[in-house]
C-alpha cells in the first residue's frame, strides 16, 4: 500500500491541508515494522535454544504480523508440529519452553527494539525510512 497523499480543500476562502490519512498510515506501519523486528529477534533467540537439541524444529520457527489486528504471533509452522511437546512438555519429557524463555529473558531488548520505532514518531522523514514495504513475509 502506497503512502496516502496530503488532502487539500478550500472552505470559505481558507485552504486547509489534512494529513490525517498519512499520519494514520504512518502509525500503523511503524507498529507493523516494530512487531516485525521484534518477531525476527524472538525467532532468532528461540532457534538458538532449539538448535542444540534438533535442527528441524528451528527451521520451522516463524513469526506472523497480522495487518488487521496489528499483533504478533510467534510459533511453529506445520512442519514443526511436535514443537508444542517440547515447549510444554509431556509425561516423559520435561518442557524446554524455548519460546517463552526467548521472550522472558530478553524483555529489555524487546523494549529497546520497539522503543526505536516509538521515538521516531516525532520525525516523519525518519519514520518513512524505517518502513520497508517490500518486506512482507516473516521468516
Where is each model-derived feature located?
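Short, Lys/Arg-rich flexible segments
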Residues: 1-139
Amino acid at each position: 500500500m502506497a503512502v496516502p497523499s496530503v488532502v487539500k480543500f478550500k472552505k470559505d476562502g481558507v485552504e486547509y491541508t489534512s494529513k490525517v490519512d498519512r499520519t494514520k498510515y504512518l502509525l500503523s506501519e511503524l507498529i507493523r515494522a516494530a512487531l516485525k523486528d521484534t518477531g525476527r529477534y524472538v525467532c532468532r533467540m528461540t532457534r538458538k535454544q532449539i538448535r542444540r537439541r534438533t535442527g528441524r524444529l528451528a527451521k520451522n520457527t516463524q513469526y506472523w504480523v497480522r495487518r488487521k489486528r496489528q499483533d504478533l504471533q510467534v510459533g511453529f509452522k506445520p512442519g514443526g508440529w511436535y514443537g508444542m511437546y517440547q515447549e510444554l512438555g509431556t509425561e516423559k519429557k520435561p518442557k524446554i519452553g524455548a519460546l517463552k524463555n526467548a521472550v522472558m529473558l530478553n524483555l529489555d531488548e524487546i523494549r529497546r527494539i520497539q522503543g526505536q520505532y516509538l521515538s521516531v514518531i516525532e520525525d516523519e522523514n525518519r519514520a518513512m525510512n524505517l518502513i520497508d514495504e517490500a518486506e512482507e513475509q516473516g521468516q
